[in-house]
Amino acid sequence: MNRPLTPVLLFLAILAVPLIGPRLFAQASNLRVNNEKPEKGGQSKRIHPHGLKLILQGKKKEAIAYLNKYKDDKVNPEQTQMLIDLALEKPNAWKFDAKTWPWKRTLPNTSLKKDAPSDKFTIAFGGGAGYVPPHERMWDTIGAIDPRALLLLGDNVYIDDPKTPEMQLFHYYRRQSQPEWAKLAKKVPIYAIWDDHDFTTNDGWGGPAIDEPKWKRDVWKIFKDNWDNPYYGGGEKQPGCWFDFWIGKVHFVLIDGRYYRESPKGKNPSMLGPAQMKWLKKTLKEPATFTVFCTNVPVTPKVKPGSKDT
């Protein structure tokens, strides 16, 4: 932000689309989980998720043969070995939980930097942070500016597999085990909302129902376990990842554009759902020197050519 605070109410974005409409196309999108071998698209970072998927499908011999091809690869060979041990059913193999994960994890801690801010402070915004080993240095780049907080606005990991909790845990744990991430998370508060790739699959939506499809609540619980937001939507009765918080007199409002989103093919589809919309209208009325409104997708139609995912 890096500027003196003045008594002005600032909205960084304006809701420019109808968010409440009739319950047309009121179901979740079809999942498009891509299990193709990652080398077909040069996606070497997907080697381990593909190997894990084979293991979870019971194709352990195929997984071992596949992973052995990359055993000496420079891309996290220790993780390759971990998955081979998992496929071999070794007694000390990872058991799909935090306790048996082989490496130390560093989770976000939003209780950091709670002292009163000065009239100038810096906020970092990010997202679209799929795991690419050579690019993990980005956390060092962010840490170098020593922001008051980092706000991650979705696609913070690329899971694309909402029905498979083991896959979700692997992606979170892998990121939390990286030294660059650990260094940043130990000194900067990190807040997060999700988008399609860490909630569902590409350009997907959850639909208006709280517990349909059944995977929605499970994805939400894993998200909660791996971030440290002040609260998560309306809690158990109304799951979601929307929340707000303050730094001094600056009000940060972050919304959830996936859990209750309806099909963009319907007439006047909702992006937020009625409960979140009610919360948002009330929250935006709170007086602040600045109100910073954060969303996982553009809120203006037609800004993504060829896509209605706004």
Question: Model-derived features: where do they sit?
Answer:
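Bacterial N-terminal signal peptides that target proteins for export
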Residues: 1-10
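Acidic, histidine-bearing metal-coordination/catalytic regions of metal-dependent phosphoesterases
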Residues: 24, 28-39, 43-46, 50-68, ...
